[in-house]
Regions:
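N-terminal Rossmann-like NAD(P)+-binding domain of SDR-like oxidoreductases, especially those catalyzing
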Residues: 1-179, 233, 302, 309, ...
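C-terminal substrate-binding subdomain of Rossmann-fold SDR/epimerase-dehydratase oxidoreductases
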Residues: 25, 32-33, 57-60, 184-326
Length: 326
């Protein structure tokens, strides 16, 4: 069988790096999109650079996207690039919309213009549910986004559905609930906690300031979730899938597991800082992954506690080696 080719936008991010590893292991030729005019932040894919090809394009520039699709001639296009940090979407709502809404449209247009046989994956988000209409959430639960990020992702989701139905594209959206790893950005609460625990354990810090510790999320391992992305594009028909664990945990539980793993008493080190509270918090986000389990045969392999301890261990190792960032 001829080797497949994949194009990944957002390859320098958490999900992009795990997806690139997965596809390389499956024998794919992998192209990644990086934005021009900036030194790409490649620490997550440093170990892959000799095995992948990076191309310059920008979700804000239609012609650049068409060009990279023409250059790479992919069988599969995974659109993972986005402004993905929810709190900053309040600071930059217009730019968030440009990337996460119009950017998806430009990516789909590139596929439609170059080759309608390319299979397209869109990274949708549980943040689309926001003020949830039902618990747990499924593929048919109505969206009620509570941030500019969530709103932009709803647009990206529905424009993908529209291109599938209007142009017959093989276009899928994965409605991914929160997924973490040692490669998660330091600004996200899971990584903020595990990095904070490691710093306190090593004597580099004494306090960890957090916002709402009652906030609950359905957290899984990013390495498991990229497997679901790939599985979607191997199906006979395109469809949308919730990818989640089906379990919710609070930030408080995250704190307790992380501190306990490092042999620390969280109560001596954790404080509340109102500046980390969101203008509008989302409700009880728990995904129902039944469709993905039944139709794709997908199953998460890393449980919550294992995920948290994996991240604490990675941050301890990184800081012990003198790598303060990322």
């Amino acid at each position: 069988m001829a080797h497949k080719t994949a194009l990944i936008s957002g390859i320098t991010g958490q999900d992009g790096s795990y997806l690139a590893e997965l596809l390389l292991d499956k024998g794919y030729k992998v192209y990644g999109v990086v934005r021009r005019l900036s030194a790409p932040n490649v620490w997550r894919i440093q170990h892959l650079l000799e095995r992948i090809t990076l191309l310059q394009a920008d979700l804000l520039d239609q012609l650049s996207l068409i060009k990279v699709v023409e250059q790479s001639r992919p069988d599969e296009f995974y659109n993972l690039a986005a402004m993905s940090f929810v709190p900053s979407s309040w600071d930059q709502p217009m730019l968030t919309g440009e990337f996460n809404a119009q950017g998806v449209t430009r990516a789909l247009e590139a596929v439609r213009s170059v080759n309608t046989k390319i299979k397209f994956y869109q990274a949708s988000s549980s943040e689309m549910y926001g003020r949830v209409r039902e618990v747990p959430q499924t593929e048919t639960t109505p969206f009620y986004p509570r941030s500019p990020y969530g709103v932009s992702k709803v647009f990206g989701h529905y424009i993908t559905v529209n291109y599938r139905e209007s142009y017959g594209l093989f276009a899928c959206s994965g409605i991914l609930f929160n997924h973490e790893s040692p490669r998660r950005g330091i600004e996200f609460v899971t990584r903020k906690v595990t990095d904070g625990v490691a710093r306190i354990k090593l004597g580099l810090a004494d306090k960890l300031m957090l916002g709402n510790r009652d906030a609950c999320r359905d957290w899984g391992f990013a390495g498991d979730y990229v497997r679901a992305m790939w599985m979607m594009l191997q199906q006979p028909e395109p469809d949308d899938y919730v990818v989640a664990t089906g379990e919710a945990h609070s930030v408080q539980e995250l704190v307790e597991v992380a501190f306990a793993h490092a042999g620390l008493d969280w109560q001596k080190h954790v404080g509340v800082d109102p500046k980390f509270l969101r203008p509008a918090e989302v409700d009880h986000l728990i995904g129902n992954p039944q469709k993905a389990r039944q139709k794709l045969g997908w199953q998460p392999e890393v449980a919550f506690k294992g995920l948290v301890t994996m991240m604490v261990d990675a941050d301890l190792a990184r800081l012990s080696a003198g790598q303060l960032i990322p």
